[in-house]
């Protein structure tokens, strides 16, 4: 019987991590042995009161500040000494709090300027420009200069421009600062969508309500050390966290950004849906390989195929498949594709082979491209 292998050690995703970061200013230690990690396809918050060390930690991940001790890694590659532009070439995008659009360039030229540095042909650059303008609802301001944009339009332009080079991670510094409440929801929906592009997001922001509401996980820094880490719910329910940071009356306002509402607003591009299914197939191949090498080689327990995927908790593989199923259902509804919807609805619910199901779904998705 084919068996599935689930382990946090076993993943195709890329990870940014820090190990024991330390930063001192004169005799004061502002970051004290801080270790965090961000995986592709998740949203992580870096939170804390003023003076807690969160901004200094964030800037060490970005490459703006060099740590006195500790290291920053992209997977197992040490990137601590690399300048920002080299980190960007490795797929680490950064959006500062301050406006970063070229003020005297139009929206389309802001994006085109970045596309010109890519390996795409002129035709491909033009196609990608139109895709980004459409995806971020910027067509109506495409000819407007950067200094004429609203706060929300500016943020959407900055994120669209960052995506022009297909980053693996985006580091967001105060993304909700200086924009109105409607624009905040707009940016939240966009950040949620980035997760479904398999982009890892690290956010630091003083607006804790807006930030926690979209985070999968968060780190809370107090006096330069990690005081608490966990899901947004775990932080919100912790009495000490409430006492020291959130306040007694704090209420976590979760919105299902990742399902019907946000995805019906921003849509799921066909190419992203295809990429997700292909990623699942590649992951499955690795699982089969792990299974043939035997339990001894990995030191982990195997899970039989007749175990329900829903019973596998938060293991990376099962979580990815469950989210993929929901994405497929949403895509089928959006595009009124009964066949995709039917296949997605049955996915993970019967005794069918996952590899066969994924290949069948992939064929239907690719037929949409023709």
Identify the residue ranges that each predicted region occupies.
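Catalytic Walker B motif of ABC-type/P-loop ATPase nucleotide-binding domains
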Residues: 170-174
């Amino acid at each position: 019987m084919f068996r599935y292998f689930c382990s946090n050690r076993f993943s195709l995703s890329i990870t940014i991590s820090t190990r024991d970061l330390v930063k001192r200013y004169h005799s004061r230690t502002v970051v004290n042995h801080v270790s965090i990690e961000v995986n592709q396809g998740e949203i992580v918050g870096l939170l804390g009161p003023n003076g807690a060390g969160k901004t200094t930690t964030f800037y060490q991940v970005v490459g703006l500040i060099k740590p006195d001790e500790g290291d920053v890694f992209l997977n197992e590659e040490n990137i601590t000494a690399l300048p920002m532009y080299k980190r960007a070439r490795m797929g680490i995008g950064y959006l500062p709090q301050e406006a970063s659009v070229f003020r005297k360039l139009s929206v389309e030229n802001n994006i085109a300027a970045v596309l010109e540095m890519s390996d795409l042909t002129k035709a491909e650059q033009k196609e990608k420009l139109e895709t980004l303008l459409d995806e971020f609802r910027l067509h109506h301001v495409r000819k407007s200069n950067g200094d004429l944009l609203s706060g929300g339009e500016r943020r959407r332009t900055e994120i669209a421009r960052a995506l022009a080079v297909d980053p693996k991670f985006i580091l967001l510094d105060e993304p909700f600062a200086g924009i109105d409440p409607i624009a905040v929801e707009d940016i939240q929906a966009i950040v949620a969508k980035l997760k479904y592009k398999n982009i890892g997001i690290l956010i630091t922001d003083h607006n804790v309500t807006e930030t926690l509401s979209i985070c999968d996980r968060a780190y809370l820094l107090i006096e330069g050390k990690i005081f608490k880490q966990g899901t947004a719910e775990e932080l919100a329910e912790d009495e000490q966290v409430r006492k020291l940071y959130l306040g007694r009356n704090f209420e976590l306002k979760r919105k299902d950004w990742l399902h019907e509402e946000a995805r019906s607003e921003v849509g799921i591009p066909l190419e992203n849906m295809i990429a997700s299914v292909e990623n699942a197939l590649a992951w499955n191949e690795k699982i089969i390989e792990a299974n043939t090498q035997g339990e001894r080689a990995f030191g982990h327990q195997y899970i039989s195929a007749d175990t329900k995927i829903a019973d596998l908790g938060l293991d990376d593989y099962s979580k990815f498949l469950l989210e993929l199923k929901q994405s497929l259902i949403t895509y089928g509804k959006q595009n009124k594709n009964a066949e995709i919807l039917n296949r997605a609805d049955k996915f993970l619910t019967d005794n069918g082979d996952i590899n066969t199901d994924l290949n069948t779904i992939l064929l239907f998705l690719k037929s949409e491209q023709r």
